[in-house]
């Protein structure tokens, strides 16, 4: 059912959805949680963010296959998360010169072989940020997966790259 139905029938969730985490029922029965959800939605609207749920066709199909896939993805920008070709690049935060060069060369060559590939990484120091910069340099779409909320860019020094990714 809808989110409103889940909320209105929160006490019945264990019977309706066997295996539901009891913490979910407790959280739904907390007025502060409802207020927090309203604040989140205001933030989403104010900052022109988008969200996808597991039921949305545009939700990343590969991620949906994971047992612990997030129920909701918040994002900013425009991309097809279900592209045929996706490469995830993550690595050390203390990238060596060799690692940085390999990242640049790999994405340069990949852009020639597969120009529609989507590059996914974090926004952390090291290989993550180098992957995004190399993707941008090669005109490849790139997506940053953040471990924190969308209310800030961290590390802040990567703000320009994050803005460039949205252009």
Regions found by a protein language model. Name each.
Residues 1-57:
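Short, small/acidic-rich helices and loops at N termini and domain boundaries
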Residues 45-47, 53-167:
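Glycine-biased, small-residue-rich flexible motifs in mid-sequence functional cores and linkers
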């Amino acid at each position: 059912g809808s989110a409103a139905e889940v909320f209105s029938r929160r006490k019945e969730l264990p019977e309706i959805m066997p295996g539901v985490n009891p913490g979910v029922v407790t959280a739904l029965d907390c007025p502060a949680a409802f207020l927090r959800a309203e604040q989140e939605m205001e933030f989403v609207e104010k900052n022109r963010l988008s969200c996808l749920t597991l039921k949305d066709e545009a939700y990343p199909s590969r991620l949906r296959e994971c047992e612990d896939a997030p129920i909701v993805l918040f994002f900013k920008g425009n991309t097809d998360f279900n592209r045929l070709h996706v490469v995830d690049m993550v690595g050390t935060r203390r990238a060596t010169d060799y690692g940085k060069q390999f990242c640049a060369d790999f994405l340069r060559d990949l852009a020639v072989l597969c120009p529609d590939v989507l590059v996914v990484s974090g926004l952390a120091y090291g290989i993550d940020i180098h992957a995004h910069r190399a993707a941008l340099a090669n005109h490849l779409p790139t997506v940053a997966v953040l471990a924190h909320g969308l209310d800030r860019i961290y590390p802040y020094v990567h703000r320009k790259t994050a803005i460039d990714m949205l252009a």
